[in-house]
Swiss-Prot record:
InterPro entries: 3-dehydroquinate_DH_AS, Aldolase_TIM, DHquinase_I, Type-I_3-dehydroquinase. One of its GO terms (biological process) is aromatic amino acid family biosynthetic process. Belongs to the type-I 3-dehydroquinase family. The gene is aroD. PANTHER family: 3-DEHYDROQUINATE DEHYDRATASE. It holds the Pfam family DHquinase_I. It comes from Bacillus subtilis (strain 168). Its EC number is 4.2.1.10. This is 3-dehydroquinate dehydratase. One of its GO terms (molecular function) is 3-dehydroquinate dehydratase activity. PROSITE patterns: DEHYDROQUINASE_I. Pathway: Metabolic intermediate biosynthesis; chorismate biosynthesis; chorismate from D-erythrose 4-phosphate and phosphoenolpyruvate: step 3/7. 3-dehydroquinate binds at E46, W47, R48, R82, R213, S232, Q236. Involved in the third step of the chorismate pathway, which leads to the biosynthesis of aromatic amino acids. Catalyzes the cis-dehydration of 3-dehydroquinate (DHQ) and introduces the first double bond of the aromatic ring to yield 3-dehydroshikimate. It is an enzyme of class 4 (lyase).
Amino acid sequence: MNVLTIKGVSIGEGMPKIIIPLMGKTEKQILNEAEAVKLLNPDIVEWRVDVFEKANDREAVTKLISKLRKSLEDKLFLFTFRTHKEGGSMEMDESSYLALLESAIQTKDIDLIDIELFSGDANVKALVSLAEENNVYVVMSNHDFEKTPVKDEIISRLRKMQDLGAHIPKMAVMPNDTGDLLTLLDATYTMKTIYADRPIITMSMAATGLISRLSGEVFGSACTFGAGEEASAPGQIPVSELRSVLDILHKNTRG
């Protein structure tokens, strides 16, 4: 698995990189949250645009991207609009979703962008090309809030993301029992050791899946999400607790 280094942050080696989401609804809340989150020193700050009250207004979104870029300084900035069908806060038709991502990429003020795998292969490929032209890295994602697919299906989706040009494939699943957690961890380890030629992010959600958010360095997930002001998905824990566990594992599990 190759390491991806963006602005000096090496994704795919050492401790999993910590991503903190911004979950504010208003511009003021989001900018205040960005200032607070910076103090927690994440590796990557994610703006969850689907929570923003003006997410349908592309001009408002691009203006806020510019303000966030100034606030975050050189911190890595991930732009994510999570669609409703994949657990997001806002309904948006596909053409509007694609246009929003295009606008975000063309600001050149973001470092990474989330593109959902099931947005149509041609659409995804076009967005990946646009991202690469603008020096934006692609986190390609899929989320199952109902269940954990079988191991081969998880691997198949992650491999498809690689084939479509993802710089970082990402998969999040919901466990119904601890066996599902083991399925996700097994799929992650197999993907990392056999198929992945780039960093991947995986997680099993909710309380049952918590160990997957902590054990990325062991099984092969390159980043993990911690809660800043507010969690963006079930199972996220506060960043200070997350970092201390990652640190313990990093110091004590290396051969």
